[in-house]
UniProtKB/Swiss-Prot annotation:
One Gene Ontology term from the biological process aspect of the record: arginine catabolic process to succinate
Organism (species): Escherichia coli O17:K52:H18 (strain UMN026 / ExPEC)
Reaction catalysed by this enzyme: succinyl-CoA + L-arginine = N(2)-succinyl-L-arginine + CoA + H(+)
Record-given protein name: Arginine N-succinyltransferase
Task of the protein: Catalyzes the transfer of succinyl-CoA to arginine to produce N(2)-succinylarginine.
GO molecular function: arginine N-succinyltransferase activity
Length: 344
């Protein structure tokens, strides 16, 4: 059975294996053991209540409960940009016009922005390619909404998610090549690694401070503004079905879109509800896949089950109860996947 649980110190080698499969561009999952160990420690200290809000971040893994295999990772940053500035480009417009010459030009322009400072962030979503089946991607991505719904007071009113931009298999980013490299004088992979390992001072030091007309970029770079890496397209679709939207903010490195949503408008958060759980044999029928989560902050668990999403009393097997760290009579959080999201 596939289960979402909080990360543990012993997961570092599994996270290293996942990091080696990302293909680059996933800044928050670098193949660097010291960085990943520090990330795990920060998550553990967050759960233990030892960090200020500006440093808090939760990390979860997707585990096969039978074999112990870690198949994926996802995370939530509680409030971005309160320690180090959190940069985006806002894609806006500058108008240059002359009535005398009968000239009017509305020019797409990139403005350096810290507009998302303080927002909660969905990040570090990666599922091992071998496990991209049977609804695992939905479970991994949406489990975070179950945690946010259960512990709403831990998070801020706006949630953002940076989507990986267009990068080829050799680490070539058209957006970086045309813009970032001119200011940072390094390859995309180097900048990506520095950022992923926490060495972010260079961003503030070297970032272009003035608006940039996109027409000055290569056509290839212009074409990828706000576009996602092909492997990231499913993750974008999942978030958009939950209510997230692209509001013209992009990543400063690869030009990928930043999606955002008010936390209380996220579908899975808004529609999830608490039901009593009982042990038994679940009813047979053509039921939709539903996320089921416990309400245990320190031992949080989420699984995917097929059941009636309108039920008031959820029947689970002993194995499912064990996976959820629940007992008969406990209350669990339940929400169905979107109707079009198939798990088989």
């Amino acid at each position: 059975m596939m289960v979402i649980r909080p990360v543990e110190r012993s997961d570092v080698s599994a996270l290293m294996q996942l990091a080696s499969k990302t293909g680059g561009g996933l800044t928050s999952l670098p193949a660097n053991e010291a960085t990943l160990s520090a990330r795990i420690e920060r998550a553990i200290k967050t759960w233990q209540g030892e960090l200020p809000k500006s440093e808090q971040g939760y990390v979860f893994v997707l585990e096969d409960s039978e074999t112990g295999t870690v198949a994926g990772i996802c995370a939530i940053e509680v409030a971005v940009g309160l320690n180090d500035p959190w940069y985006n480009y806002r894609v806006g417009t500058l108008v240059h016009a002359s009535k005398e010459l009968n000239v009017y030009n509305a020019l797409p322009t990139l403005f350096l922005s810290n507009d998302h400072t303080g927002s909660s962030e969905l990040c570090t979503l990666f599922l091992d390619p071998e496990w991209r089946k049977e609804g695992n991607g939905y479970l991994l991505s949406k489990s975070r909404f179950m945690f946010m719904a259960a512990f709403r007071d831990k998070f801020n009113d706006k949630v953002v998610a940076e989507m990986r931009g267009v990068i080829d298999e050799h680490g070539y980013s058209p957006f970086w090549q045309s813009l970032g490299k001119r200011f940072f004088s390094m390859d995309f992979s180097r900048a990506d690694f520095l950022c992923g390992t926490g060495q972010k001072a260079f961003i503030a030091e070297l970032m272009p401070k003035h608006p940039i007309y996109t027409h000055f970029l290569s056509q290839e770079a212009q074409d990828v503004i706000g576009q996602v890496h092909p492997q990231t397209a499913p993750a974008r679709a999942v978030l958009e079905k939950e209510g997230f939207r692209y509001r013209n903010y992009i990543d400063i490195f690869d030009g990928g879109p930043t999606l955002e949503c008010d936390i209380d408008r996220v579908r899975a958060i808004r529609k999830s509800r608490l039901v009593e759980v009982a042990e038994g044999q679940p009813a047979q029928g053509d039921f939709p896949a539903c996320l089921v989560a416990n309400e245990n902050y320190h031992h949080f668990r989420v699984v995917l089950v097929r059941t009636d999403p309108a039920t008031e009393r959820l029947i689970l097997t002993a194995a499912q109860l064990d996976a959820l760290k629940c007992h008969a009579g406990d209350r669990v959080r339940l929400v169905r996947l979107c109707a079009e999201e198939k798990t088989a």
